[in-house]
A protein has these predicted regions:
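Structural alpha/beta core scaffold segments of enzyme domains
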Residues: 1-200
Length: 201
């Protein structure tokens, strides 16, 4: 099966996110947590009025990333749970105006005890049991039963560019262009966050 995007990628004709441009673009940056765990006490912004700032209250739909469980906010509300957790979105018509943003936007926290041991966390791991057929009977009839614990390293893909998206709003709809491995995950999350029907995203 020939990949639809194969020729464009191997010949260098494929467009990167930074190659795309639309009228009246606003460039965005994310203000992220600098501590692993804490309550947000205050935010300090020294930005001119031509900047746009959005927080969790500006999300039209429920504030969570729709993946498996609705347990991860898109933008932190009053507490951060890991370094680099998104808190604010900042936009400007000039992408160069976003450089050095960390010197003009800062968060004040009440630090809480972090957890550096993933195996001691009650939120990092999930046990999902897939049972098919009569398990007890199968075990009783088995000649050999192998029980063990396996650990594997973290796997990540090799992207041809850093992740990025461009969202183009329309009349009650949103079109998103992105460097995405799994666009259906992004689609599912955006439908919830934007509070739009699935066929409008």
């Amino acid at each position: 099966v020939r990949r639809k995007d194969g020729d464009a990628k191997v010949t260098g004709e494929a467009k990167y996110i930074d190659d795309l441009a639309f009228p009246n673009m606003i460039y965005g940056a994310t203000v992220r947590s600098t501590i692993p765990h804490g309550r947000i006490r205050a935010r300090h912004l020294t930005l001119t009025p031509d900047f746009i700032v959005a927080d969790h209250r500006d999300i039209p739909g429920p504030n969570y990333v729709a993946l498996i469980d609705p347990d991860q906010p898109c933008l932190a509300v009053d507490q951060v749970r890991h370094v680099a957790e998104p808190i604010l979105l900042v936009g400007h018509a000039d992408k160069h105006a976003l450089i050095g943003l960390e010197s003009r936007v800062s968060m004040e926290y009440d630090a809480l005890p972090p957890n550096y041991d993933a195996t001691a966390s009650d939120v990092c791991f999930k046990k999902i049991s897939i049972d098919k057929g009569d398990i007890d009977r199968g075990l009783a009839d088995a000649d050999i039963i192998v029980e063990s614990e396996y650990r594997t390293g973290h796997q990540e893909q090799l992207y041809i560019e850093t992740n990025g998206v461009i969202a183009v709003p329309g009349d009650g709809e949103m079109t998103v262009y992105g460097s995405l491995q799994c666009p259906y995950y992004v689609h599912k999350a955006l439908v919830v966050l934007l509070n739009l029907p699935a066929d409008r995203v």
